[in-house]
Amino acid sequence: LVNSKIEKTITEGICFHVEVQDLDFDFINDLDWVIILGNVLDNAIEAAAETDTKFLFCGIIKDNDFLTILIKNSCKSQIINIENLYQSGHTTKGDGHGIGLFNARKILSQYPDILHNTNCNNNYFLQQLKLPETFTSKGKRVNISAV
């Protein structure tokens, strides 16, 4: 997934920094993982491509008792109404769009212990997911360090 996004950033002329530790993601359904990360990265690439800075960072790291997934990209807007982004049908792209982040949030609701934070500040958009070392995945307790 990340490799295909790297190719897209090269095509768009985006400076893409990636920091991914060798981690096992068996605790999240593969399709859920692809939908969440794919939508967030696609939106980040599209937003970064519209800026002069053209910057994107993707970090997936285990730090202390958390697995942290961080996506940060340049964007044109200083301030974005974050709640609107997650409404079904909300889009800046035209017809046939506006379900990606809505679906991502719906999937994330199945993992109640995943902390999801979205922020826009100083022309940078940030999405952060934090998974505690032990959390609930679709009704089952999972320990990341045991995965």
Where do the protein language model's features map onto the residues?
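Conserved ATP-binding N-box helix of the HATPase_c
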Residues: 30-52, 110
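Glycine-rich/acidic phosphate-handling loop/turn and adjacent ATP-lid/helix
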Residues: 67-98, 142
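Conserved short strand/loop->alpha-helix "switch" segment adjacent to the catalytic nucleotide/phosphoryl-transfer site
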Residues: 16-37
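Heptad-repeat coiled-coil segments of the DHp/HisKA dimerization-phosphoacceptor module
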Residues: 18-22, 62, 75, 120
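Short beta-to-alpha transition helix within the HATPase_c
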Residues: 1-12
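Glycine-rich nucleotide-binding loop
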Residues: 98, 120-128, 134-135
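Short beta-strand/loop element within the Bergerat-fold HATPase_c
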Residues: 51, 55-65
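Conserved glycine-/histidine-rich ATP-lid loop and adjacent helix of the Bergerat-fold HATPase_c
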Residues: 103-115
